[in-house]
């Protein structure tokens, strides 16, 4: 059975923090960060939520795919930073985009979460249980980071 990705969408938090700005708060420098990670800037979720960014990206993906929210039968959201424990972020996205008939749940598997979510959707499609799935990865790590820990705050946003 041929399975394909029909559309993609993205959403970035509005606030951008440079290495120079970060060096005002922790013992680091642009040179130290970029030489070790290649990172120059990161995005910080101030007003955005995991769900709001996921919903925006989902709508863009549906538009690119030429599909309506009503066509979506499965929503899998990969995140370690849900807005709430319940309802799941996927259920919130489901309501936000109007995919009322979709099965919706979250996958919490850190960096590999999106890969697991994609594989779960693939298995649902291969079994014939659904035809159209929406797989989303969305994080707001900036809300849970220790901004005094140079070992992690330079990596995530």
Summary of predicted features, one role per range:
Residues 53, 80-81:
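Short beta-strand to alpha-helix junction loop
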Residues 1-73, 97:
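Conserved "HGTGT" condensation-loop signature of ketosynthase/thiolase-family condensing enzymes
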Residues 74-79:
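Short glycine-rich or small-residue beta-strand-to-loop segments that form or flank ligand, phosphate
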Residues 63-70, 83-157:
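Acyl-thioester C-C bond-transforming condensing/cleaving domain
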């Amino acid at each position: 059975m041929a399975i394909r990705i029909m559309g993609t969408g993205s959403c970035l938090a509005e606030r951008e923090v440079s290495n120079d700005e970060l060096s005002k708060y922790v013992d680091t420098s642009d040179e130290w960060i970029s030489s070790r990670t290649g990172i120059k800037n990161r995005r910080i979720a101030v007003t955005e939520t995991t769900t709001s960014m996921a919903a925006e990206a989902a709508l863009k993906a549906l538009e690119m795919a030429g599909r309506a929210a009503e066509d979506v039968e499965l929503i899998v959201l990969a995140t370690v930073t849900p807005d709430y424990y319940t309802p799941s972020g996927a259920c919130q996205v489901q309501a936000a985009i109007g995919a009322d008939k979709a099965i919706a749940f979250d996958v919490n598997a850190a960096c590999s979460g999106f890969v697991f979510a994609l594989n779960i959707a693939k298995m649902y499609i291969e079994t014939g249980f659904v035809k159209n799935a929406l797989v989303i990865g969305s994080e707001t790590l900036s809300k849970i980071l220790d901004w005094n820990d140079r070992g992690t705050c330079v990596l995530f946003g």
